[in-house]
Amino acid sequence: QKIQDPRFTSVEVDAGDLVALEGLIKKVNPDVVINAVDPRFVMQIFTAAQNTGVNYIDMAMSLSKAHPTDPFHKTGVMLGDEQFAQAEAWEKNEKYALIGIGIEPGMSDIFARYAQDYLFSEIDAVTILDGSNLTVDGYDFAPSFSIWTTIEECLNAPLLWDNGKWHTSEPFSGGVVFDFPEGIGPVECVDVEHEEVVLIPKKVKANHVSFKYGLGADFINTLKTIHALGLSKKEKVNYRGMEIAPRDFLASLLPDPAKIGPLMHGKTCAGAHVKGLDKEGKPYACYIYNVVDNQWSMDNYGDQAVVWQTAINPVIAMELIANGTWKPRGVVGPEWMEPKPFLDLIEQYGSSWHIRDEDPAGLAL
């Protein structure tokens, strides 16, 4: 029904076919290409926009490649490296590629930039914390986001920023139990690979940056089992004459995250825990966050909470670019932009953001 809305037209295209993508972009001649596709196809769509001279927005960045000999200590190709490598070409063409403007990355990065500009004189640590109490009727294991992407970011070596350098660690390390707001409560969180750890240090001066995902013990154990059985592999294997990637097969067995909204209950939270010195030089810590209730998003938009929470951010970004408030140029992340106009619009779009004071001696390490 949404696709049949007269304000929109739809067309089928292979997101992995660069020539087909370029042909479609030339035919439509848009002001901006918005990439909401699986991150495996980021570089094809990004390159197609670049080759056709069209602005670009995405909500997840180009994939990483592990260090060949020491993957749990040293970085290889980091998230977004392939995109940032083209920054000079985008600037020369006087076009923008605003990358990582979903909820995480995206709103979370804007929270970090806001903290630097308005709340802190010195930042020791920024810890992005994502957690929920979402349940899905009839399923013991039903990720609210792409299982392909969930496996990618949780089983890859977590990326960390410490004292001016990026490094990696073992999957599921750095565990803490964080008490999420608005009734979500305590959730076990672990370090994972995520774009914020690449983006935030480029524009926010902090000694430490990490991303901790509130998976919970059961989800973590399930992912460990998936990995132990080899079902997390994205390389194709031959099974009785058929070529199939175990991860793709696993994804086909699980419910589509876009269709489980009516079965979902609970809330999801995304935010930045920031610790340092406030503008008066006193120790201070806070959690800047956004919570979406699944019942609210289903009632008002017909979309489940995680989908809606992600999708609203590029819409706000496009409005700010269209009215001239934001003027991106080249390859940039959310931190490059003034945060307050974005946060003001969150309220106008029916959502909200909040600041909860935290113990300056706790977390964010």
Language-model features, listed with the residues they occupy:
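Conserved Rossmann-fold cofactor-binding substructure of NAD(P)-dependent oxidoreductases
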Residues: 12-29, 37, 41
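Adenosine-phosphate binding glycine-rich loop
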Residues: 82-133
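C-terminal catalytic/substrate-binding lobe primarily of soluble NAD(P)-dependent oxidoreductases
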Residues: 117-365
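Rossmann-fold NAD(P)-binding glycine/threonine-rich loop
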Residues: 60-95
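N-terminal Rossmann-like NAD(P) cofactor-binding module of classical short-chain dehydrogenase/reductase
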Residues: 25, 31-36, 49, 56-58
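Short, conserved SAM-binding/catalytic segment
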Residues: 2-8
